[in-house]
């Protein structure tokens, strides 16, 4: 199902902003992929990239066992941009010198720019950049010239304009580098001569055509959760093959308020899909009885989901393909050597090894914001496209500790109130994710003239662009006040509300 388009390769050296670099490139309507630094030059040539970007990373170029690239990558005739560690590695590999200075640079830094260079065309001679480095390039390789400096960094950027090889010590991909997107655009269009041929409208059209050709007259099965990713994947495949697609919606009893009914109404009635809803709440709760460890909960739910799904699939006769709503961050996080597993993904892995289906993952090239854009192109209701991210294990990981039906109901009702008030305040699309969870905490309160000892509800709301990092949302006090009063008054068994003001990192967005 490969679609021909101009390609930029982002070579991953383990930096924290690697996915952000890829997203910034795509914001210019240019397609890019992230590959590990271990990818051979031969494999890179086969991909026929029009430009290559080296990311940052935590290593020193002169350290033992540090990530390297083959020198031949610079001889492909493909424009190269090195960022931070990628800048240092470019200099080091081509004969320059990298040192560790006495004074390091972190944070906002003014950079002085030679805007006669194509890389900095149309950019001010002095502007704000974002630095985060310990080492620096002290001598540039032969054939290069310095095109930017800072007070502490003599080579903030360098260029071999004949070979179209560039390096920048700062991070153009972060918002704090005020000219970053302009500079990346210059590299893509003025240096590499790329066309902006990546759009969600063309993606959807091409993907529908490719799915039709791949599937032919065979049958396809989709595990539908009602979340954004699986919903967009299902509609995309349905547009291609219609009634050859059957969706199985496993209602594990861990959904938000009225969510199961909403999913059924949208996909069965509005889109006229073959939809099987399996009400398996009692089965899942039985398996989770007495379990409090979050990873154990995830694994039990994942395994039981597969069992239920397989049972339903077995009733349908011969099925040739399985649709998954895998998106690009899932692929990157599960497929590179440079990042650690934080939590097990519900959607990646976990499938039985002897699975008889071939996988269709129509969204595996897309970031979340691109998935939403495709959803809008396909005519999926705006409310569903902008539905809050919801983990596969559902409320099981928003009820901390052991799960009971009573705790689930408390969490559902509190969460529904929070979501309703956020919508009424017009904040739905300004906050990346918001939800109520039930910590395993009870506290003393006074309601009426009586002492109470009831549950605490924690509210969590974050701003983000990609969920890789996030900050806590500054919700107006009057909105929080109304949410708090409503939950305490309307949800039985709750006497205290707290608001989580932790960013990611150090915390994750979900509590479990």
From Swiss-Prot:
It is an enzyme of class 6 (ligase). ATP binds at residues 225-231. The keyword ATP-binding applies. Residues 198-387 form the GMPS ATP-PPase domain. One of its GO terms (cellular component) is cytosol. CDD domains: GATase1_GMP_Synthase, GMP_synthase_C. GO terms for molecular function: ATP binding; GMP synthase activity. It catalyses: XMP + L-glutamine + ATP + H2O = GMP + L-glutamate + AMP + diphosphate + 2 H(+). The active site is at 84 (nucleophile), 171, 173. The keyword Transport does not apply. Keywords: ATP-binding, Glutamine amidotransferase, GMP biosynthesis, Ligase, Nucleotide-binding, Purine biosynthesis. Its EC number is 6.3.5.2. PROSITE patterns: GATASE_TYPE_1, GMPS_ATP_PPASE. It comes from the Bacteria. Residues 7-197 form the Glutamine amidotransferase type-1 domain. Pathway: Purine metabolism; GMP biosynthesis; GMP from XMP (L-Gln route): step 1/1. Catalyzes the synthesis of GMP from XMP. Homodimer. NCBIfam families: guaA_Cterm, guaA_Nterm, PRK00074.1. This is GMP synthase [glutamine-hydrolyzing]. It comes from Clostridium novyi (strain NT). The lineage of its organism: Bacteria, Bacillati, Bacillota, Clostridia, Eubacteriales.
């Amino acid at each position: 199902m490969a679609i021909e388009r101009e390609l930029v390769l982002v070579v991953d050296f383990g930096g924290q902003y690697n996915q952000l670099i890829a997203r910034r490139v795509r914001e210019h309507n240019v397609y890019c992929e992230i590959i590990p630094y271990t990818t051979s030059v031969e494999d890179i040539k086969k991909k026929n990239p029009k430009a290559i970007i080296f990311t940052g990373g935590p290593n020193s170029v002169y350290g033992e066992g540090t990530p390297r690239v083959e020198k031949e990558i610079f001889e492909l005739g493909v424009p190269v941009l090195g960022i931070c560690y990628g800048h240092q590695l470019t200099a080091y590999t081509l004969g320059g010198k990298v040192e560790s200075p006495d004074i390091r640079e972190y944070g906002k830094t003014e950079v002085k720019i030679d805007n006669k260079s194509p890389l900095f065309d149309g950019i001010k001679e002095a502007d704000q950049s974002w630095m985060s480095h310990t080492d620096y390039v002290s001598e540039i390789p032969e054939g290069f010239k310095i095109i930017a400096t800072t007070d502490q960094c003599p080579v903030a950027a360098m260029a071999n304009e004949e070979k179209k090889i560039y390096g920048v010590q700062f991070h153009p991909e972060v918002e704090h580098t005020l000219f970053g997107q302009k500079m990346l655009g210059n590299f893509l269009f003025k240096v590499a001569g790329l066309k902006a041929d990546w759009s969600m409208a063309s993606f959807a059209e091409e993907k529908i055509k490719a799915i039709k050709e791949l599937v032919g007259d065979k049958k396809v099965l989709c595990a539908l959760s009602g979340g954004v990713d699986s919903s967009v994947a299902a509609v995309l495949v349905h547009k291609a093959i219609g009634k050859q697609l059957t969706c199985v919606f496993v209602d594990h009893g861990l959904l938000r308020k009225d969510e199961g009914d909403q999913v059924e109404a949208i996909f069965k009635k509005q889109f006229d899909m073959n939809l099987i809803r399996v009400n398996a709440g009692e089965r899942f709760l039985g398996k989770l009885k007495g379990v409090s460890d979050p990873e154990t909960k995830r694994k039990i739910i994942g395994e039981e989901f597969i069992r239920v799904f397989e049972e339903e699939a077995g009733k349908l006769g011969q099925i040739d393909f399985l649709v998954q709503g895998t998106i690009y961050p899932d692929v990157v996080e599960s497929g590179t050597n440079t990042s650690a597993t934080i939590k097990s993904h519900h959607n990646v892995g976990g499938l039985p090894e002897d699975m008889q289906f071939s996988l269709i993952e129509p969204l595996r090239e897309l970031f979340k914001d691109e998935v939403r854009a495709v959803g809008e192109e396909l005519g999926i209701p705006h409310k569903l496209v902008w539905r809050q991210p919801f983990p596969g294990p559902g409320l099981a990981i928003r009820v901390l500790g052991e799960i009971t039906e009573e705790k689930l109901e408390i969490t559902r009702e509190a969460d529904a109130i929070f979501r309703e008030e956020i919508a009424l305040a017009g904040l739905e699309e300004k906050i990346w994710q918001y939800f109520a969870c039930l910590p395993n905490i009870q506290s003393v309160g006074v309601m009426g003239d009586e002492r109470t000892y009831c549950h605490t509800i924690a509210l969590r709301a974050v701003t983000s662009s990609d969920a890789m990092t996030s900050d806590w949302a500054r919700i107006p006090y009057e909105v929080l006040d109304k949410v708090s009063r409503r939950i305490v008054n309307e949800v039985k068994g709750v006497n205290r509300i707290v608001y989580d003001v932790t960013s990611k990192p150090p915390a994750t967005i979900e509590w479990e």
